[in-house]
Amino acid sequence: MKIGIIGGGSVGLLCAYYLSLYHDVTVVTRRQEQAAAIQSEGIRLYKGGEEFRADCSADTSINSDFDLLVVTVKQHQLQSVFSSLERIGKTNILFLQNGMGHIHDLKDWHVGHSIYVGIVEHGAVRKSDTAVDHTGLGAIKWSAFDDAEPDRLNILFQHNHSDFPIYYETDWYRLLTGKLIVNACINPLTALLQVKNGELLTTPAYLAFMKLVFQEACRILKLENEEKAWERVQAVCGQTKENRSSMLVDVIGGRQTEADAIIGYLLKEASLQGLDAVHLEFLYGSIKALERNTNKVF
């Protein structure tokens, strides 16, 4: 099967490596230099102290000559991708973004494509234009959005590497909100406080603030089992206690964060429902202020 991976970041390179073991994969990049490097060198993956390599094609333009397109760019980069996707023929498109900001866009995006959404539970760090470090084994989980047919992707994903499992979930909202609640509790606080994930559990004041954020987000998302969700947030914090969240890494690196995708979605939903979200509003404003002052690390 022919699969196009849109985005040459950590998730894009990770997906491209593993999917290329079973499919004809092309990475669609923004920069010609990266496309040329992937075309000539392939993709290198580092895992458990070993290096692996896979051949892969690359290009800088999107076309409809694919059985599946996997969109891995960050949410704030999606608008240019949407406009490109509107110009190609009908195909299957899987969106793998942090947060849920793109959901509002997808609901208003009236195209003939079959749309799917998913989450990435792997840890990955891009080392170069052609290399990715697989830092944590997890899974890709996906679901059909609106009236898309799940069988189309189930056929595509029937063969996968054991270190890169791909699972179908029946309820896209439950799938995405399950990860969103974790990201909303951990990412903004660690970025604001400049701490590793584990400190949110070991510092009482941080834990108390995280619980307030959790309760506010739960009310907005109307989560069914808050106790189980809170246990999940704490478990992820503990399992990744030595990690710096992606939002903290972006703040330190002077890059735009995914605050709009994570907190922005919750604030928009709160507004639509007429709910107060004072803690999330504070976090959102604080992170956006940090983005404007990227030369300052507190």
Curated annotation (Swiss-Prot):
Location in or out of the cell: Cytoplasm
Pathway(s) served: Cofactor biosynthesis; (R)-pantothenate biosynthesis; (R)-pantoate from 3-methyl-2-oxobutanoate: step 2/2
Signal peptide positions on this chain: none
Lineage: superkingdom: Bacteria
Gene Ontology molecular function, alphabetical: 2-dehydropantoate 2-reductase activity; NADP binding
EC code(s) of this entry: 1.1.1.169
Enzyme active site: 179 (proton donor)
GO biological processes: pantothenate biosynthetic process
UniProt catalytic activity: (R)-pantoate + NADP(+) = 2-dehydropantoate + NADPH + H(+)
SUPFAM superfamilies: 6-phosphogluconate dehydrogenase C-terminal domain-like, NAD(P)-binding Rossmann-fold domains
Any one annotated GO CC term: cytoplasm
Residues that hold NADP(+) according to the record: 7-12, 98, 124, 258
The entry's keywords: Cytoplasm, NADP, Oxidoreductase, Pantothenate biosynthesis
Binding site for substrate: 98, 183, 187, 197, 246
PANTHER family in the cross-refs: 2-DEHYDROPANTOATE 2-REDUCTASE, 2-DEHYDROPANTOATE 2-REDUCTASE-RELATED
Family of this protein: Belongs to the ketopantoate reductase family.
Function: Catalyzes the NADPH-dependent reduction of ketopantoate into pantoic acid.
Protein name as it appears in the record: 2-dehydropantoate 2-reductase
Taxonomic classification: Bacteria, Bacillati, Bacillota, Bacilli, Bacillales
Gene, per the UniProt record: panE
